[in-house]
UniProtKB/Swiss-Prot annotation:
Function of the protein: Cortical cytoskeleton protein found in a complex involved in maintaining cell polarity and epithelial integrity. Involved in the regulation of mitotic spindle orientation, proliferation, differentiation and tissue organization of neuroepithelial cells. Involved in axonogenesis through RAB10 activation thereby regulating vesicular membrane trafficking toward the axonal plasma membrane.
Organism: Homo sapiens
Family that this chain belongs to: Belongs to the WD repeat L(2)GL family.
A Pfam family matched in the record: LLGL
Encoding gene, per UniProt annotation: LLGL1
Record protein name field: Lethal(2) giant larvae protein homolog 1
Length: 1064
């Protein structure tokens, strides 16, 4: 009979079809700023911008929501990019001197980016392929000749090659060799020296046949491509960095390595030109750094703009990253906090226009993109609708809030608009507006909250493709730090010369690492939130539309409860400011709760309907009533051997003494493992469990090699008292007839504490509850036998659905939970998921995820998956991410595996740690310090770029035949989006679900019938726990007096045998 129990049932076609309608894995879009940018391009006709990166990625941006992404086959650095103006084509140059042609093509009404052709410059004539010096043919600069499909390639060997862009083939007979240029140079200038590499190629605005060529030695040449001759020569002597034509083409501007720039007059009467008309060193006379790039733009109102990067005094400000903007007598030195990659101006490019009249200056930095309005006095920055630097301060935590009410959304946006730090606001709209966003307006608004190292919390609009900044909350003003001193120094520096002006928001330095935000929780119905930090600070805030000046109440909770033998060796707590403090419109602090010891907060949860906030650290957890501003509960979870928990966050290395002690313990344990131990009640119970396991798993049934037993962990493991999760629920804890508020806490050692709360009920129709004190009584204490850290806890109602959020049911925003049937609690540990019935806490279902060696649960969330085939059908499932980077989806409460996907590379530890799931089957994780990858597990709820671009060039069959491949998405470099469906029959029949009405804001959850772990339908579970019998120690502190006496009597006889539950 046991053989039939382990036989796998066949897949149910109906269920497999339903799973395909519910689940689908897609990596959809990358939010944030590209990591390690290396090149920049702009198409003034289509108004689109391209950014290349060191990893070989190409990203094109237009209007908000218009994005295209491509990835070169070789992970080489993109050094230059150039648009074929108005054609939707882009030419990229890599550091291996290969050229690649990209095209924006349309399929089914939407556009995407494809690589069409690639080209490698052949070896220098006269050399064979093996002996040719690579430096001679290394491409240093690329120019796309206007009004033609020709590209000029400048090389390190001083040659200029010409290329047919449509086919990426060399044009024979048109190569400009250095010898031909040297014949036009006076003998005294040559002096037997080479010209040097080609540093710059610039096209003539009105005459495309004329090309300005600059060599590194300083020689400037105007080459006429039509007549194949030199039109003009400028005999420069300074090492050249960059070139620029004047608008009327009568002047040429050059910048040099000594921090100077020169203006040359193109006078046909003087050949060659020996001296420039103007030569100046803006920040001289002392030695200066090179001016890497210079732009000259004239204005109809008179005068001209001179914009250049670099040129700072080498000794004083050689480490600054600056772009200088000079017009008439006005000079502004834009001081950035990261390296300058490139910049361009948005100006008129029509040949018939007489003036440039620049509107904006776009500067691409290593860590952000800054756009300045050149038409408004003061040249203020233009707010960016995307490409905001997520990592302006290092991201320390993140959270997602789905279905934000419109009223709260408007209040947050209004508060953010009042935060403009600039004295003058820009009247210029975002200048990069190309393409059309075809995606529908999102029906629901989503907020992404990111906590940062500098104590700020940033609010992002995550409803669509473009991640737009909305509001920034700063908590540093509540505490005494050294920032005032730094601000005074910065103010003093601004009065000096050069006239520095701080631009951009990237600031990687934090005034105090204790300000770092560790946990964030927001109630979208009451506009209240909690922010918890690195030094044990827990801040409760409330949204206000007007600025106020008020003092903040401070409460201190000692989690150790004066326990002896523990001494905190970490950092001190932050000192709060006293007295009334000014607070701008936005989230304003209501009360500050300080945990002692001041360790980093590891878990937090907020229940606004009860006005309670719970928080946990590595020492214990606390409960605080922020309405009465009084503590309710403090519980220490430290084990006597948890000495490492007192070291603080900076002491992560075990001491040599402790490491040696544990090593000798392991050696002794291995030597005596074969000896017979003294029999006691606990060992007898374990032996009985082992016998049951052997009986349940006959020897003729072969176990899968990757499966293993879950080994129980030692109770004295370091940091076993860390609180991993906290949870509020209105459920049955005392008995099956009376439900009430409860609080649940899970720790690193597999302990779960459940408290019954006495919360005064609010009056009918009232928002606030009475002022009576809240009481907390320990109801249950569950110790998981395998002692794996508890990652998440959730209570399921009688229909198997998770309980709604605070105020959702009372305000008719979600269906009320079923309080008639039996509730259950889902406890997710790092090794397995278990469902217990309430209030008896007896085993109902479980799933052992660690049957795969080395697999651990890292992130868990309950999500709603709507069907693409039927709008009225949805299921609530459990989504989890493992340390291997795999995402698994399970049914609830049956814990049946539905699908699993490979999402993140297992080596990407930071990406796995940063993952956040949404309530509707999507997720975010960091692929770099500045970028979130967005993915979707839902077949219906997908956020991806859907856009088009109006292109003005014909697409004939010849050009289409050159297309070699579609570019892979950059996101695939960080995990293969393969889809693996569970092969076995999972639920027999589709799970029932109630309908989704149009007036229901939140999608409904599936009402799944509870399954017993011994039922016949559970026999097809692939990763069953048979043979891995564990015992949970459950202590009930709310039973009847007779049961309590019995428990105490049993506890006195044998503590390990008390209230034991056997789970098979």
């Amino acid at each position: 009979m046991m053989k039939f129990r382990f036989r796998r049932q066949g897949a149910d076609p109906q269920r497999e079809k339903l799973k395909q309608e519910l689940f689908a894995f897609n990596k959809t879009v990358e939010h944030g700023f590209p990591n390690q940018p290396s090149a920049l391009a702009f198409d003034p006709e289509l108004r689109i911008m391209a950014i290349g990166t060191r990893s070989g990625a190409v990203k094109i941006y237009g209007a908000p929501g218009v994005e295209f992404t491509g990835l070169h086959r070789d992970a080489a650095t993109v050094t230059q990019m150039h648009f074929l103006t108005g054609q939707g084509r882009l030419l990229s140059l890599l550091d291996d001197s290969s050229l690649h042609l990209w095209e924006i093509v349309h399929h089914n009404g939407c556009a995407h980016l494809e690589e069409a052709l690639s080209f490698q410059l052949p070896s220098r004539p006269g050399f064979d392929g093996a002996s040719a010096p690579l430096s001679l043919t290394r491409v240093t600069v690329v120019l796309l000749v206007a009004a033609s499909d020709i590209a000029a390639l400048g090389t390190e060997g001083s040659s200029v090659f010409f290329l047919d862009v449509t086919t990426l083939t060399l044009l024979e007979g048109q190569t400009l060799a250095p010898g031909e240029v040297l014949r036009s140079v006076p003998d005294d200038y040559r002096c037997g020296k080479a010209l040097g590499p080609v540093e710059s190629l610039q096209g003539h605005l009105r005459d495309p046949t004329k090309i300005l060529i600059g060599y590194s030695r300083g020689l400037l040449v105007i080459w006429n491509q039509a007549s194949q001759c030199v039109d003009h020569i400028f005999l420069g002597n300074q090492q050249l960095e960059s070139l620029c034509w004047g608008r009327d083409s009568s002047t040429v501007v050059s910048s040099h390595s000594d921090g100077s720039y020169a203006v040359w007059s193109v006078d046909a009467g003087s050949f060659p030109t020996l001296q420039p008309t103007v030569a100046t060193t803006p920040y001289g006379p002392f030695p200066c750094k090179a001016i890497n790039k210079i732009l000259w733009r004239n204005c109809e109102s008179g005068g001209h703009f001179i914009i250049f990067s670099g040129g700072m005094p080498r000794a004083s400000y050689g480490d600054r990253h600056c772009v200088s903007v000079l017009r008439a007598e006005t000079l502004v030195t834009l001081d950035f906090t990261s390296r300058i990659i490139d910049f361009f101006t948005v100006h008129s490019t029509r040949p018939e226009d007489e003036f440039d009249d620049p509107q904006a200056l776009a500067v691409l930095l290593e860590e952000e993109l800054v756009v300045l309005d050149l038409q408004t006095p003061g040249w203020p920055a233009v707010p960016a609708p995307y490409l905001a630097p997520l990592h302006s301060s290092a991201i320390t935590c993140s959270a997602h809030v789905a279905s934000v009410p419109a009223k709260l959304w408007a209040r947050i946006v209004s508060a953010g608009e009042q935060q403009s730090p600039q004295p003058v606001s820009s009247a210029l709209s975002w200048p990069i507006t190309g393409g059309r966003n075809l995606a529908q307006e999102p029906s629901q608004r989503g907020l992404l909250l990111t906590g940062h190292e500098d104590g700020t919390v940033r609010f992002w609009d995550a409803s669509g493709v473009a991640l737009r900044p909305l509001y920034k909350l700063s908590t540093a003003g509540l505490f005494q730090t050294d920032c005032e001193h730094a601000d005074s120094l910065a103010q003093a520096a601004e009065d000096d010369w050069p006239p520095f002006r701080k631009v951009g928001c990237f600031d990687p330095y934090s005034d105090d690492p204790r300000l770092g935000v560790q946990k964030v929780a927001l109630c979208k119905y009451t506009a209240q939130m909690v922010v918890a930090g690195t030094a044990g600070q827990v801040l409760v805030l409330e949204l206000s539309d007007v600025p106020v000046e008020q003092a903040v109440s401070v409460a201190i909770i000692d989690l150790l409860q004066d326990r002896e033998g523990f001494t905190w060796k970490g950092h001190e707590r932050l000192s709060p400011r006293t007295g009334p403090l000014p607070w701008p419109a936005g989230f304003q602090p209501r009360v500050l709760v300080q945990c002692l010891p001041p360790a980093a907060v590891t878990a937090v949860t907020l229940h606004t309907e009860w006005s309670l906030v719970a928080f946990g650290t590595s020492h214990g957890f606390g409960l605080f009533d922020y309405q009465r501003k009084s503590p309710v509960l403090a519980r220490c979870t430290l084990h006597p051997n948890d000495s490492l928990a007192m070291e603080g966050p900076l002491s992560r290395v075990k001491s040599l003494k402790k490491s040696l002690r544990q090593s000798f313990r392991r050696i002794r344990k291995s030597r005596v493992s074969g000896k017979k131990r003294a029999a006691n009640a606990s060992s007898k119970l374990q032996e009985a469990n082992a016998q049951l396991a052997e009986q349940a798993c006959p020897h003729d049934v072969e176990m899968t090699p990757v499966q293993r037993r879950i080994e129980p962990r030692s109770a004295d493991d370091s940091l076993s008292g860390v609180v991993r999760c906290l949870y509020f629920a209105d459920t049955f804890l005392r008995d099956g007839a009376h439900h009430g508020p409860t609080m649940w806490a899970g720790t690193n050692s597999g302990s779960v504490f459940a408290y019954a709360l006495e919360v005064p009920a609010a009056a009918v129709g009232g928002e606030k509850r009475p002022e009576q004190a809240v009481e907390a009584v320990l109801g249950k204490e569950v110790q998981l036998m395998h002692r794996a850290p508890v990652v998440a806890i959730a209570v399921l109602d009688g229909r198997g659905r998770p309980l709604p959020e605070p105020y959702e049911a009372s305000r008719d925003l979600a269906q009320a939970p079923d309080m008639q049937g039996g509730h259950a609690v889902l406890i997710a540990s790092e090794e397995q998921f278990k469902v217990f019935t309430l209030p008896k806490v007896s085993a109902k279902t479980k799933f052992k995820l660690t049957a795969h060696e080395g697999c651990r649960v890292r992130k868990v969330a309950l999500a709603t998956f709507a069907s693409v085939a039927c709008e009225d059908y949805a299921e609530t499932c459990l989504a989890c991410l493992t340390n291997l980077g795999d995402v698994h989806v399970f049914s609830v409460p049956g814990l049946r595996p539905q699908v699993h996907y490979s999402c993140i590379r297992k080596e990407d530890i930071s990406g796995i740690a940063s993952c956040v799931f949404t309530r509707h089957g999507q997720g975010f994780y960091l692929i770099s310090p500045s970028e979130f990858e967005r993915f979707s597990l839902s077949a219906r709820n997908i956020t991806e770029p859907l856009c088009s671009l109006d292109i003005n060039w014909p697409r004939d069959a010849t050009q289409a035949s050159y297309r070699i491949r579609e570019s892979p998405k950059l996101s695939q470099a960080n995990g293969t989006p393969s889809i693996l469906l569970a092969p076995q029959s999972l639920d027999g029949s589709p799970d029932p679900a109630h309908s989704m009405g149009p007036d229901t804001p939140e999608p409904p959850e599936a009402a799944l019938s509870p399954m017993s772990i011994d039922s016949a339908t559970s026999a097809d579970t692939t990763l069953d726990t048979t043979g891995d019998v564990t015992v949970e120690d459950v202590k009930d502190f709310l039973g009847s007096s007779e049961e309590s006496e019995k428990n105490l009597r049993n506890l006195a006889e044998d503590e390990a045998h008390a209230c034991a539950i056997l789970i098979k």
